[in-house]
Amino acid sequence: MIFSTFEHILTHISFSVISIVITIQLITLLINETVGLYVSSEKGMIATFFCITGLLVTRWIYLRHLPLSDLYESLLFLSWAFSIIHLFTYFKKYKNHLSVSAITAPSTIFTQGFATSGFLTEMHQSPLLVPALQSHWLMMHVSMMVLGYAALLCGSLFSVALIVITFQKAIRIFCKNNNLLNALFSFNEIQYINEGNYFVRNTSFFSSKNYYKSQLIQQLDHWSYRIISLGFIFLSIGILSGAVWANETWGSYWNWDPKETWAFITWTIFAIYLHTRTNKNFEGVNSAIVASMGFLIIWICYFGVNLLGIGLHSYGSFTLTSN
Protein backbone atom coordinates (compact mmCIF):
# COMPACT_ATOMS: atom_id res chain seq x y z
CA MET A 1 0.00 0.00 0.00
CA ILE A 2 2.83 2.39 0.88
CA PHE A 3 4.67 1.67 -2.36
CA SER A 4 1.47 2.08 -4.37
CA THR A 5 0.77 5.47 -2.77
CA PHE A 6 4.36 6.61 -3.30
CA GLU A 7 4.17 5.53 -6.94
CA HIS A 8 0.92 7.46 -7.39
CA ILE A 9 2.49 10.61 -5.92
CA LEU A 10 5.61 10.37 -8.08
CA THR A 11 3.50 9.83 -11.20
CA HIS A 12 1.51 13.01 -10.66
CA ILE A 13 4.54 15.06 -9.63
CA SER A 14 6.53 14.07 -12.72
CA PHE A 15 3.62 14.75 -15.06
CA SER A 16 2.86 18.12 -13.43
CA VAL A 17 6.48 19.25 -13.51
CA ILE A 18 7.03 18.31 -17.13
CA SER A 19 3.75 20.01 -18.13
CA ILE A 20 5.11 23.22 -16.63
CA VAL A 21 8.40 22.64 -18.44
CA ILE A 22 6.61 22.36 -21.80
CA THR A 23 4.76 25.63 -21.15
CA ILE A 24 8.01 27.38 -20.23
CA GLN A 25 9.78 26.10 -23.33
CA LEU A 26 6.97 27.31 -25.58
CA ILE A 27 7.41 30.76 -24.04
CA THR A 28 11.18 30.69 -24.48
CA LEU A 29 10.79 29.66 -28.12
CA LEU A 30 8.65 32.74 -28.77
CA ILE A 31 10.41 35.21 -26.48
CA ASN A 32 14.11 34.46 -26.42
CA GLU A 33 14.99 36.96 -23.68
CA THR A 34 13.56 34.84 -20.87
CA VAL A 35 16.87 33.28 -19.84
CA GLY A 36 15.66 32.68 -16.29
CA LEU A 37 12.69 30.66 -17.52
CA TYR A 38 14.98 28.55 -19.69
CA VAL A 39 17.15 27.67 -16.69
CA SER A 40 14.02 26.83 -14.70
CA SER A 41 12.80 24.51 -17.44
CA GLU A 42 16.07 22.58 -17.35
CA LYS A 43 15.82 22.24 -13.58
CA GLY A 44 12.29 20.96 -14.11
CA MET A 45 13.54 18.30 -16.53
CA ILE A 46 16.13 17.20 -13.99
CA ALA A 47 13.39 16.93 -11.36
CA THR A 48 11.24 14.95 -13.80
CA PHE A 49 14.09 12.55 -14.48
CA PHE A 50 14.49 11.81 -10.77
CA CYS A 51 10.72 11.39 -10.33
CA ILE A 52 10.48 8.85 -13.16
CA THR A 53 13.60 7.11 -11.83
CA GLY A 54 12.00 6.92 -8.38
CA LEU A 55 8.81 5.60 -9.96
CA LEU A 56 10.65 2.79 -11.75
CA VAL A 57 12.71 1.90 -8.68
CA THR A 58 9.56 1.81 -6.54
CA ARG A 59 7.85 -0.63 -8.90
CA TRP A 60 11.05 -2.69 -9.05
CA ILE A 61 11.11 -3.02 -5.27
CA TYR A 62 7.52 -4.04 -4.62
CA LEU A 63 7.08 -6.14 -7.78
CA ARG A 64 10.52 -7.75 -7.31
CA HIS A 65 11.40 -7.64 -10.98
CA LEU A 66 12.58 -4.99 -13.42
CA PRO A 67 9.47 -2.99 -14.46
CA LEU A 68 9.49 -3.96 -18.12
CA SER A 69 6.90 -6.73 -18.21
CA ASP A 70 3.96 -4.87 -19.80
CA LEU A 71 3.07 -1.89 -21.96
CA TYR A 72 2.62 0.50 -19.03
CA GLU A 73 6.04 -0.23 -17.56
CA SER A 74 7.78 -0.13 -20.93
CA LEU A 75 6.22 3.29 -21.64
CA LEU A 76 7.53 4.57 -18.31
CA PHE A 77 10.97 3.25 -19.21
CA LEU A 78 10.69 4.86 -22.65
CA SER A 79 9.81 8.20 -21.05
CA TRP A 80 12.80 7.82 -18.72
CA ALA A 81 15.07 7.13 -21.71
CA PHE A 82 13.79 10.28 -23.47
CA SER A 83 14.64 12.34 -20.38
CA ILE A 84 18.18 10.89 -20.36
CA ILE A 85 18.72 11.98 -23.97
CA HIS A 86 17.40 15.44 -23.11
CA LEU A 87 19.74 15.83 -20.13
CA PHE A 88 22.68 14.44 -22.11
CA THR A 89 22.38 17.18 -24.73
CA TYR A 90 21.97 19.75 -21.94
CA PHE A 91 25.08 18.77 -19.98
CA LYS A 92 27.07 18.53 -23.21
CA LYS A 93 26.42 22.29 -23.51
CA TYR A 94 24.98 21.88 -26.98
CA LYS A 95 24.62 25.42 -28.36
CA ASN A 96 21.27 24.73 -30.05
CA HIS A 97 19.94 22.77 -27.08
CA LEU A 98 16.70 24.78 -27.08
CA SER A 99 15.88 23.40 -30.52
CA VAL A 100 16.72 19.86 -29.38
CA SER A 101 14.69 20.22 -26.18
CA ALA A 102 11.68 21.19 -28.31
CA ILE A 103 11.76 17.54 -29.44
CA THR A 104 13.00 15.61 -26.40
CA ALA A 105 10.85 17.33 -23.75
CA PRO A 106 7.50 16.82 -25.57
CA SER A 107 8.51 13.22 -26.31
CA THR A 108 8.93 12.70 -22.58
CA ILE A 109 5.61 14.26 -21.59
CA PHE A 110 3.52 12.60 -24.30
CA THR A 111 4.92 9.17 -23.45
CA GLN A 112 4.53 9.77 -19.73
CA GLY A 113 1.04 11.16 -20.25
CA PHE A 114 -0.18 8.15 -22.19
CA ALA A 115 1.40 5.73 -19.73
CA THR A 116 -0.43 7.36 -16.81
CA SER A 117 -3.71 7.86 -18.68
CA GLY A 118 -6.89 5.91 -18.06
CA PHE A 119 -6.20 3.59 -21.00
CA LEU A 120 -3.60 1.67 -19.00
CA THR A 121 -5.16 1.89 -15.52
CA GLU A 122 -5.62 -1.88 -15.27
CA MET A 123 -1.89 -2.36 -15.87
CA HIS A 124 -0.76 -0.14 -13.00
CA GLN A 125 -1.07 -3.15 -10.72
CA SER A 126 1.15 -5.60 -12.57
CA PRO A 127 0.25 -9.31 -12.20
CA LEU A 128 2.76 -12.04 -11.52
CA LEU A 129 5.13 -12.73 -14.37
CA VAL A 130 4.18 -15.54 -16.69
CA PRO A 131 6.78 -18.36 -16.81
CA ALA A 132 8.23 -17.15 -20.13
CA LEU A 133 9.12 -13.79 -18.55
CA GLN A 134 10.68 -15.23 -15.41
CA SER A 135 14.18 -15.04 -16.82
CA HIS A 136 17.31 -12.97 -16.36
CA TRP A 137 17.04 -12.17 -20.07
CA LEU A 138 14.06 -9.91 -19.33
CA MET A 139 16.32 -7.12 -18.12
CA MET A 140 18.84 -7.50 -20.93
CA HIS A 141 16.49 -7.93 -23.88
CA VAL A 142 13.66 -5.52 -23.08
CA SER A 143 15.83 -2.74 -21.65
CA MET A 144 18.06 -2.76 -24.74
CA MET A 145 15.06 -2.75 -27.06
CA VAL A 146 13.34 0.16 -25.30
CA LEU A 147 16.55 2.18 -25.08
CA GLY A 148 17.02 1.51 -28.79
CA TYR A 149 13.46 2.65 -29.53
CA ALA A 150 13.97 5.86 -27.54
CA ALA A 151 17.23 6.76 -29.27
CA LEU A 152 15.94 5.90 -32.74
CA LEU A 153 12.72 7.86 -32.19
CA CYS A 154 14.64 10.96 -31.06
CA GLY A 155 17.12 10.67 -33.90
CA SER A 156 14.28 10.26 -36.39
CA LEU A 157 12.49 13.32 -35.03
CA PHE A 158 15.69 15.34 -35.45
CA SER A 159 15.70 14.21 -39.08
CA VAL A 160 12.06 15.26 -39.50
CA ALA A 161 12.94 18.68 -38.05
CA LEU A 162 15.89 18.89 -40.44
CA ILE A 163 13.62 18.28 -43.43
CA VAL A 164 11.07 20.85 -42.25
CA ILE A 165 13.71 23.53 -41.64
CA THR A 166 15.47 22.82 -44.93
CA PHE A 167 12.35 23.35 -47.02
CA GLN A 168 10.75 26.19 -45.11
CA LYS A 169 10.93 29.53 -46.91
CA ALA A 170 11.84 31.78 -44.00
CA ILE A 171 12.69 31.75 -40.33
CA ARG A 172 10.44 34.01 -38.32
CA ILE A 173 11.97 35.32 -35.15
CA PHE A 174 9.98 36.94 -32.37
CA CYS A 175 12.01 39.49 -30.45
CA LYS A 176 11.86 42.93 -28.90
CA ASN A 177 15.06 44.49 -30.13
CA ASN A 178 17.99 43.99 -32.44
CA ASN A 179 20.30 42.99 -29.60
CA LEU A 180 18.50 39.68 -29.37
CA LEU A 181 18.94 39.08 -33.08
CA ASN A 182 22.62 39.89 -32.80
CA ALA A 183 23.10 37.45 -29.95
CA LEU A 184 21.07 34.77 -31.68
CA PHE A 185 23.05 34.98 -34.90
CA SER A 186 26.39 35.56 -33.17
CA PHE A 187 27.02 38.86 -34.95
CA ASN A 188 28.16 42.01 -33.21
CA GLU A 189 25.60 44.31 -34.76
CA ILE A 190 23.34 44.88 -37.75
CA GLN A 191 24.84 47.71 -39.71
CA TYR A 192 23.08 50.34 -41.69
CA ILE A 193 24.62 52.27 -44.56
CA ASN A 194 23.52 55.83 -45.16
CA GLU A 195 23.45 56.64 -48.86
CA GLY A 196 21.95 60.12 -49.46
CA ASN A 197 18.42 60.22 -48.11
CA TYR A 198 18.06 56.44 -47.92
CA PHE A 199 19.04 53.97 -45.25
CA VAL A 200 20.10 50.70 -46.80
CA ARG A 201 20.16 47.72 -44.52
CA ASN A 202 23.40 45.77 -44.73
CA THR A 203 23.00 42.33 -46.21
CA SER A 204 24.76 40.84 -43.18
CA PHE A 205 21.35 40.45 -41.54
CA PHE A 206 20.11 38.19 -44.30
CA SER A 207 23.43 36.37 -44.39
CA SER A 208 23.19 35.83 -40.65
CA LYS A 209 19.74 34.27 -41.04
CA ASN A 210 21.07 31.88 -43.65
CA TYR A 211 24.11 31.18 -41.49
CA TYR A 212 21.95 30.37 -38.46
CA LYS A 213 19.68 28.14 -40.54
CA SER A 214 22.68 26.34 -42.03
CA GLN A 215 24.27 25.81 -38.61
CA LEU A 216 21.00 24.52 -37.16
CA ILE A 217 20.59 22.03 -40.02
CA GLN A 218 24.16 20.81 -39.58
CA GLN A 219 23.71 20.37 -35.84
CA LEU A 220 20.41 18.50 -36.27
CA ASP A 221 22.06 16.24 -38.85
CA HIS A 222 25.02 15.68 -36.52
CA TRP A 223 22.90 14.78 -33.50
CA SER A 224 20.49 12.70 -35.55
CA TYR A 225 23.38 10.58 -36.82
CA ARG A 226 24.97 10.18 -33.39
CA ILE A 227 21.76 9.26 -31.58
CA ILE A 228 20.55 6.90 -34.31
CA SER A 229 23.95 5.18 -34.29
CA LEU A 230 23.63 4.65 -30.53
CA GLY A 231 20.05 3.44 -30.90
CA PHE A 232 21.07 1.02 -33.64
CA ILE A 233 23.63 -0.55 -31.29
CA PHE A 234 21.01 -0.94 -28.55
CA LEU A 235 18.52 -2.40 -31.03
CA SER A 236 21.08 -4.90 -32.34
CA ILE A 237 21.97 -6.03 -28.81
CA GLY A 238 18.27 -6.30 -27.98
CA ILE A 239 17.51 -8.44 -31.03
CA LEU A 240 20.48 -10.75 -30.41
CA SER A 241 19.68 -11.19 -26.71
CA GLY A 242 16.04 -11.80 -27.61
CA ALA A 243 17.09 -14.53 -30.03
CA VAL A 244 19.09 -16.28 -27.30
CA TRP A 245 16.17 -15.92 -24.88
CA ALA A 246 13.74 -17.31 -27.47
CA ASN A 247 15.97 -20.33 -28.01
CA GLU A 248 16.01 -21.04 -24.28
CA THR A 249 12.24 -20.61 -23.96
CA TRP A 250 10.81 -21.95 -27.22
CA GLY A 251 13.74 -23.86 -28.71
CA SER A 252 14.16 -21.59 -31.72
CA TYR A 253 16.23 -18.44 -32.25
CA TRP A 254 13.79 -16.86 -34.71
CA ASN A 255 10.10 -17.57 -35.34
CA TRP A 256 9.08 -14.70 -37.64
CA ASP A 257 6.58 -13.57 -35.06
CA PRO A 258 4.96 -10.20 -36.07
CA LYS A 259 7.05 -8.38 -33.46
CA GLU A 260 10.23 -10.09 -34.63
CA THR A 261 9.40 -9.34 -38.26
CA TRP A 262 8.84 -5.63 -37.61
CA ALA A 263 11.95 -5.48 -35.43
CA PHE A 264 13.90 -6.86 -38.39
CA ILE A 265 12.29 -4.27 -40.70
CA THR A 266 13.21 -1.52 -38.23
CA TRP A 267 16.79 -2.77 -38.03
CA THR A 268 17.00 -2.91 -41.84
CA ILE A 269 15.69 0.66 -42.30
CA PHE A 270 18.26 2.13 -39.93
CA ALA A 271 21.02 -0.07 -41.34
CA ILE A 272 20.21 1.53 -44.70
CA TYR A 273 20.32 4.97 -43.04
CA LEU A 274 23.76 4.32 -41.57
CA HIS A 275 24.94 2.95 -44.91
CA THR A 276 23.82 6.12 -46.72
CA ARG A 277 25.83 8.16 -44.23
CA THR A 278 29.03 6.61 -45.59
CA ASN A 279 28.40 8.50 -48.84
CA LYS A 280 28.75 12.26 -48.42
CA ASN A 281 26.36 12.83 -51.32
CA PHE A 282 23.56 11.30 -49.25
CA GLU A 283 24.17 13.28 -46.06
CA GLY A 284 21.60 15.79 -44.90
CA VAL A 285 18.13 15.64 -46.45
CA ASN A 286 18.58 12.35 -48.32
CA SER A 287 19.54 10.34 -45.25
CA ALA A 288 17.00 12.27 -43.15
CA ILE A 289 14.20 10.99 -45.41
CA VAL A 290 15.24 7.40 -44.63
CA ALA A 291 15.32 8.16 -40.89
CA SER A 292 11.87 9.79 -41.12
CA MET A 293 10.50 6.58 -42.62
CA GLY A 294 12.04 4.74 -39.69
CA PHE A 295 10.04 6.89 -37.25
CA LEU A 296 6.76 5.35 -38.46
CA ILE A 297 8.24 1.85 -38.59
CA ILE A 298 9.36 2.05 -34.95
CA TRP A 299 5.87 2.94 -33.72
CA ILE A 300 4.38 0.07 -35.71
CA CYS A 301 6.97 -2.30 -34.22
CA TYR A 302 6.73 -1.04 -30.65
CA PHE A 303 3.09 -0.08 -30.29
CA GLY A 304 1.04 -1.10 -33.31
CA VAL A 305 1.81 -4.83 -33.18
CA ASN A 306 0.84 -4.95 -29.49
CA LEU A 307 -2.59 -3.48 -30.19
CA LEU A 308 -3.34 -6.12 -32.82
CA GLY A 309 -3.35 -8.77 -30.10
CA ILE A 310 -1.47 -11.34 -32.16
CA GLY A 311 1.89 -13.03 -31.83
CA LEU A 312 4.12 -14.16 -28.99
CA HIS A 313 5.18 -10.62 -28.05
CA SER A 314 1.75 -9.00 -28.06
CA TYR A 315 0.24 -7.30 -25.04
CA GLY A 316 -3.16 -7.57 -26.75
CA SER A 317 -5.81 -5.22 -25.43
CA PHE A 318 -3.44 -3.90 -22.80
CA THR A 319 -3.23 -7.37 -21.26
CA LEU A 320 0.02 -9.28 -21.03
CA THR A 321 -0.05 -12.66 -22.71
CA SER A 322 3.54 -13.82 -23.05
CA ASN A 323 7.02 -12.74 -23.98
Curated annotation (Swiss-Prot):
Plastid: is it a keyword of this entry?
Answer: yes
Q: Which organism is it from?
A: Cucumis sativus
Q: How does it sit in the membrane?
A: Multi-pass membrane protein
The protein's name = Cytochrome c biogenesis protein CcsA
Outcome after substituting residue 192 to S? In cv. Borszczagowski
Region forming the signal peptide: none
Sorted alphabetically, which keywords does the UniProt record give? Chloroplast, Cytochrome c-type biogenesis, Membrane, Plastid, Thylakoid, Transmembrane, Transmembrane helix
Q: Which Pfam families match?
A: Cytochrom_C_asm
Its gene name is ccsA
Free-text function comment from the UniProt entry:
Required during biogenesis of c-type cytochromes (cytochrome c6 and cytochrome f) at the step of heme attachment.
> Which compartments does it reside in?
Plastid, Chloroplast thylakoid membrane
Q: Does the keyword Cytoplasm apply?
A: no
Taxonomy, superkingdom: Eukaryota
- Kindly give the InterPro entries that the UniProt entry links to this protein: Cyt_c_assembly, Cyt_c_biogenesis_CcsA, Cyt_c_biogenesis_CcsA/CcmC
Enumerate the transmembrane spans: 9-29, 37-57, 71-91, 100-120, 145-165, 227-247, 261-275, 288-308
Into which family does the record put it? Belongs to the CcmF/CycK/Ccl1/NrfE/CcsA family.
Record text on subunit structure and interactions: May interact with Ccs1.
Q: Which GO terms describe its molecular function?
A: heme binding
Q: GO biological process annotations for this chain's record?
A: cytochrome complex assembly
